[in-house]
């Protein structure tokens, strides 16, 4: 298993990752605003291709380094699940996938950028991949909302939460069966986080309740406006 390496908050690396993520998202959104439908369509395919290449290259590197294994490198973390959904929704514009990105990917991506932990390697590539991935899953719903005018449906937040609960149950079964720790459902990540309270299973329950609260707030104060 690859050692998990937290990036200390307020260090130069942390600031570079945070600010470059915010800057890149804003620049791309501003650049694409008001462009023709053809440009918007091409940009969706381009982003899907870039995210796909990033995922493939990262896995090739881990295989080459002999660090790839079933217990750590399957796309079963919430942000990798969101990445795959994000790649697909860029192409097919499926409504439920967009809603997943709004309610779940946004939360996961933002908190990952604020309290980053490298889980699959610590070379320069994995630093870049970490911020590319998590800024990407924050970017995708903003892009679809602002550039393609996609909107969430009424009560979509609760349907999205149901999908998350199903994912948690399935991954708990997988984790217990294999000894994996996908979505950190068995063991807490090694990062100082205000919401990581207590030991298993209490921190899982608390995080789940906090996610529900975040989704409710996003729905009430942003989506419903």
Predicted segments, located by residue:
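Membrane-interface transmembrane-helix boundary segments in multi-pass integral membrane proteins
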Residues: 4-21, 159-166, 176-215
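A contiguous pocket-lining binding segment that forms or flanks enzyme active sites
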Residues: 114-162
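Hydrophobic cores of alpha-helical transmembrane segments in multi-pass inner/ER membrane proteins
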Residues: 17-28, 80-91, 133-147, 203-220
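Cytoplasmic-side transmembrane-helix entry/capping segments in multi-pass membrane proteins
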Residues: 41-46, 73-75, 98-106, 130
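Membrane-interface helix caps and helix-loop-helix hairpins in membrane proteins
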Residues: 63-70, 92-96, 116-128
């Amino acid at each position: 298993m690859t050692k998990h390496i937290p990036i200390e908050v307020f260090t130069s690396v942390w600031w570079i990752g945070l600010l470059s993520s915010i800057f890149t998202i804003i620049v791309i959104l501003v650049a694409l605003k008001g462009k023709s439908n053809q440009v918007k369509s091409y940009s969706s395919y381009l982003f899907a291709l870039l995210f796909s290449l990033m995922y493939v290259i990262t896995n090739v590197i881990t295989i080459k380094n002999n660090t790839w294994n079933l217990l750590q490198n399957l796309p079963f973390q919430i942000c990798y699940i969101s990445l795959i959904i994000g790649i697909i929704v860029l192409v097919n514009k499926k409504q439920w996938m967009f809603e997943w990105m709004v309610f779940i990917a946004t939360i996961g991506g933002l908190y990952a950028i604020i309290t980053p932990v490298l889980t699959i390697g610590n070379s320069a590539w994995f630093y870049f991949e970490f911020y590319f991935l998590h800024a990407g899953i924050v970017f995708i719903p903003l892009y679809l909302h602002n550039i393609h005018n996609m909107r969430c449906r009424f009560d979509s937040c609760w349907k999205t939460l149901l999908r998350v609960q199903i994912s948690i149950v399935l991954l708990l079964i997988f984790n217990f069966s294999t000894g994996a720790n996908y979505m950190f459902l068995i063991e807490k990540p090694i990062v100082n986080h205000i919401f990581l309270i207590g030991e298993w299973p209490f921190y899982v329950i608390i995080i789940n309740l906090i996610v529900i609260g975040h989704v409710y707030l996003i729905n009430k104060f942003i989506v419903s406006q």
